[in-house]
Amino acid sequence: MKMTPKIFIIGSILVWAASISLMVIFPWISMEDEPSDIWTPMNEKEKAGHDIYVNNGCHYCHSLYVRTIDWGKGAERIAQMGDYYQMQPAILGTERTGPDLSQEGGEHTDDWHKAHFINPRYTNPLSLMPSWEFLGEKKIEQLTAYMQHLGWKMADKRVARQEKWKKKAVEAYKAGPDSNITWLHEQVPEQWRNMPNPYPATEAALARGRNIYENFCLNCHGPVGDGQGKAAQYMDPPPLNFTTLKRNLAQDKYIGGIFYYQIMNGITGTAMPYFKRQLESEKIWDVSNFVAVWFVGYTDANIEPRGIDASYEPEWENPYLEDPQTMKETKEKKKEGQ
């Protein structure tokens, strides 16, 4: 058959029509648009936040789906089509310059999000994310509401948990510094409260701890550990003042295990997030030693009870321990102040 312009045009139209039918029309007719088991509708504030998210191109850096190969936050549940029921437009993103946000709801408190949107470096000094302060307070609140919606019913449970513990954390903070620290320590399991830091606070370990502190903790707890970092003005309760811990050691000698547990798990209800997905064990112990030495002026590193030292550890005597008489005087002063 001779190829003529007429045949070419008709053939092209038929191929195009077949493609559209197979890829658009038939799926649209046969596809069941049903919500997933965790889906919940957005309220007006959350819808406004979704529009802000889309209009400002947040999906250029963040995705909204969990894949079968994912291992990080939200990986407990793989994304399903019904999760995005009635989401218009359903822009899921393809890049992960920033973290996936499909299960962001309840991961952080509202005040953490406010500080983060005003300046992402306030909550993560290494963040590449631009500041969204220009949006204004109302739009930041709407965007925060949308963040807290992501995860749907699973997010609702996490948000409720944050709100429950926030009330208790604020009450403890208002009771005074020492009462606040006592309450915070009571939330740590006993075996952790009575556990010293098992690793020596060597010069190298403190240098590593300082680097971690500057990269993760600086803008909340401040350069001198007094809880007056740049983000503190947005947080209620504010970040902990480490310099008050020396008179609040567990059994007047332990602090390492408390640091480790609270850095690993965060303090739900406050802006203190968990770091168990970002920092492996040695880094948490190192930053614990750094905070203890530089801001508390004391570390329980390598005191009893202790096990066998790791093969790479150098011999090290703890120069930051107080003599028994000084420890006794500190305890008596604490009692007199109550």
Q: What name fits each language-model region?
A:
Residues 9-25:
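Hydrophobic membrane-insertion alpha-helices, especially the h-region
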Residues 26-36, 63-96, 107-110, 119-215, ...:
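Flexible coil segments in periplasmic/lumen-exposed cytochrome c-class electron-transfer proteins
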Residues 40-73:
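Short extracytoplasmic
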